[in-house]
Amino acid sequence: MPRGSIILGVDLLPIRPIPNVKTLVHDITTDECRTALKREMQTWKADVVLCDGAPNVGTAYKKDAYEQNEIALHALRVATQHLKKGGTFVTKVYRSQDYNSLMWVIQQFFEEHQAVKPASSRSQSAEIFVVGRNYKAPDFIDSRMLEPKHAFQQNYDIEGAQKGLSIFHKKYEQHNKRHRQGYADDLGMSLSRVAKV
C-alpha cells in the first residue's frame, strides 16, 4: 500500500488504535454511518471495501445467516457509494437460502466475482468470503437491489416462515415443473445431443 494511503475502519464498538488508520464507531446499516463515511472520504474513492462484520450468532441458523447476508448487502451499499471504478469488494457471507440472491446482486456491480473459503475458516463453518473485482460504477443503481427486504423477499423471513419460493429453491422447480415428455422436435428445443462414444 502506498505511503499516505487512507484506511478507514468502522465497527459498532471502539477499535483499539492502529497506526495510520482512522476508525469510526458506527453501524453500517444507518444513515449516520453513511454521512460519517462521506465526511471522511470527502471527494476520494476507495480502492477496496472490505467487510468482516458479523451479527451476534447462536439463536437459529436461518436467522444468523439472514442477518449475516443482510450485513453483506449493507456493506455492498457502502461500496457502491465509495468504491472507485475498477475497485475491489470483499465481504463475509453465509451459505444459505439467500446466497444465490446475494451473489446475483453482487454480479450486477462487478466484472468478476467469486466465493472463497480461506484456510483459516473452519471447514464446517457456513461462512465464506465473496470477492468482487473491477467495480462497474454504474451511473444508476436501483436502490431496491441493496435493500434486504427486496433482495431476499422471495426467500424466508428470519423466523423461518416461508414467504414465497425463490427461483433457486428446490420446491420451486417441483412446483413449476411441467409434466410432459418434452418439446416437439420441429421447435429446435431438443435437450439431447448425439455424440460418438
Regions found by a protein language model. Give the residues of each.
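Aromatic/acidic cage segments in peptide-binding pockets
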Residues: 3-5, 26-27, 65, 69, ...
